[in-house]
């Protein structure tokens, strides 16, 4: 156990908190753009086997970084003690790729897999994009956590765009709307977590997806709405709001795809 504690102390390195649009933030944004362009140019028309491999590799990377985060946030290097903080349990909106990407990688071709693909290019992409553009309080003094959060959210953006480009021929109203089904199912699971957490560990204020009926939402805009209306109404607005943004992303993606096809036809 002492060896494990020492090992964690070595990887739990602290330094200055990165600034919003400081050198570290800008570097991460630049790498995100560069890698997105590279993947689109190199693999936009790759076969399904290669596509699945890339999804799987991405999932493994973010899973390893998430495991690191869970260990570091649970260990107190000063006292050498362990305590799991359920606040860090990976079932938030931006954690969804941890659970969605395996379905994209392993499910057989069909409508169910398409729903997870659609979710990845819309809901998951949106979650990553928001944090990449405005990290807010995700930056902290722990160097490893800062790397983890940028790798994770950048992966959401990169995979969101890459998946959209690679799966562009599937674009349709039904394909896009299927993402809402996945989102609603995940939110339902999150609510279940929140209810159980309120019963078993009320002192930790568990609030997965910031949508629970017991703890006020901490999300921008939603934090203002939450205390003003009954929770069921808040939940409906929450699902509708996120779905509206996701469908807007799908609409923009489809516009780009249609324009690209027209340009190709003119060139031909």
Where are the predicted features?
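Juxtamembrane "helix-exit" motif on the non-cytosolic side of transmembrane helices
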Residues: 67-79, 131-141, 196
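Non-cytosolic membrane-interface motifs at loop->transmembrane helix junctions
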Residues: 78-91, 141-151
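N-terminal topogenic module of multi-pass integral membrane proteins
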Residues: 1-53
């Amino acid at each position: 156990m002492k060896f494990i504690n020492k090992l964690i102390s070595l990887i739990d390195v602290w330094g200055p908190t990165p600034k919003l649009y400081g050198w570290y933030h800008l570097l991460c944004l630049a790498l995100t753009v560069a890698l997105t362009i590279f993947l689109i140019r190199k693999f936009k028309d790759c076969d399904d086997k290669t596509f699945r491999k890339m999804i799987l590799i991405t999932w493994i990377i973010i899973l390893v970084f998430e495991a690191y985060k869970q260990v570091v946030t649970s260990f107190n290097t000063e006292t050498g003690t362990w305590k799991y903080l359920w606040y860090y349990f990976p079932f938030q909106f931006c954690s969804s790729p941890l659970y969605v990407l395996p379905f994209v990688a392993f499910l057989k071709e069909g409508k169910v897999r398409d729903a997870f693909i659609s979710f990845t290019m819309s809901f998951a992409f949106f979650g990553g994009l928001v944090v990449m553009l405005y990290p807010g309080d995700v930056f902290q003094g722990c160097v490893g956590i800062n790397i983890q959060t940028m790798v994770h959210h950048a992966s959401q953006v990169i995979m969101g765009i890459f998946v959209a480009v690679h799966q562009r021929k599937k674009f349709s109203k039904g394909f896009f709307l299927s993402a809402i089904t996945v989102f609603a199912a995940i939110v339902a699971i999150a609510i279940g977590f929140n209810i159980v957490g309120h019963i078993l560990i009320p002192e930790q204020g568990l609030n997965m997806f910031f949508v629970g009926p017991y703890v006020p939402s901490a999300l921008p805009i939603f934090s203002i709405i939450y205390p003003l209306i009954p929770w069921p109404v808040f939940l409906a607005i929450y699902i509708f709001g996120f779905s509206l943004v996701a469908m807007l992303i799908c609409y923009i993606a489809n516009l780009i795809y249609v324009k690209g096809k027209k340009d190709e036809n003119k060139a031909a």
